[in-house]
Amino acid sequence: MFQATSTGAQIMHAAFPRSWRRGHVLPLRSAKIFKPLACLELRGSTGIGGFHEIELKVRDYELDQFGVVNNAVYANYCQHGRHEFMDSIGINCNEVSRSGGALAIPELTIKFLAPLRSGCRFVVKTRISGISLVRIYFEQFIFKLPNQEPILEAKGTAVWLDNKYRPTRVPSHVRSYFGHFQCQHLVD
């Protein structure tokens, strides 16, 4: 078990049971099965088309000690924008919950560009950028009104869950709602 080296130090060889070894981690495959929605342009689009918009106002209790909106509050703004977007296309999140399903956000990347202060009016723009078997990919932007100053960029992933909170396929009727919204807004 111990082995001596030329310097006199001892080396201990340890054998760990196979069950302790970390399994081989496979790369994420979502990129391979990712399918854009019909009528949706995904190649580096910088245009702000096909977005659902909701206007909000900063409330005093959302501020931090420096007089600007606390970073954690922006995730709430994004969630509100996503819920309003889904409600506008006919998907009621409360109804999804009552039917035993759920929608989880395992990944949300937020890039802060400028702060919001008390009383600022702003718009949250939300769109679905793609969909896979169990994931919905979305983009969100916050712009300060009235001059449309960029405040925040966010990208995230939503996962459809069954009643046991395991990932499941996005229902076909939900896919059709997203596709209809995108096609309708590309025509406008």
From Swiss-Prot:
Cellular component, GO, one term: chloroplast
GO biological process terms held by the UniProt record: lipid metabolic process
Family indicated by similarity: Belongs to the 4-hydroxybenzoyl-CoA thioesterase family.
Enzyme Commission designation: 3.1.2.-
Subcellular location: Plastid, Chloroplast
Name of the protein in its database record: Acyl-acyl carrier protein thioesterase ATL2, chloroplastic
Protein's UniProt keywords contain tRNA-binding: no
Transit peptide region: 1-47
Tissue localization of expression: Expressed in endodermal and peridermal cells in young and mature roots, in boundaries of stem lateral organs and developing seeds.
Name of the gene encoding the protein in the UniProt record: ALT2
Record keywords: Chloroplast, Hydrolase, Lipid metabolism, Plastid, Transit peptide
Role of this protein: Acyl-ACP thioesterase involved in the production of fatty acids and beta-keto fatty acids. Can produce beta-keto fatty acids of medium chain (8:0 and 10:0) and small amounts of 8:0 fatty acid when expressed in a heterologous organism (E.coli). May play a role in suberin biosynthesis.
Active site annotation, chain numbering: 64
MF annotations from Gene Ontology: fatty acyl-[ACP] hydrolase activity
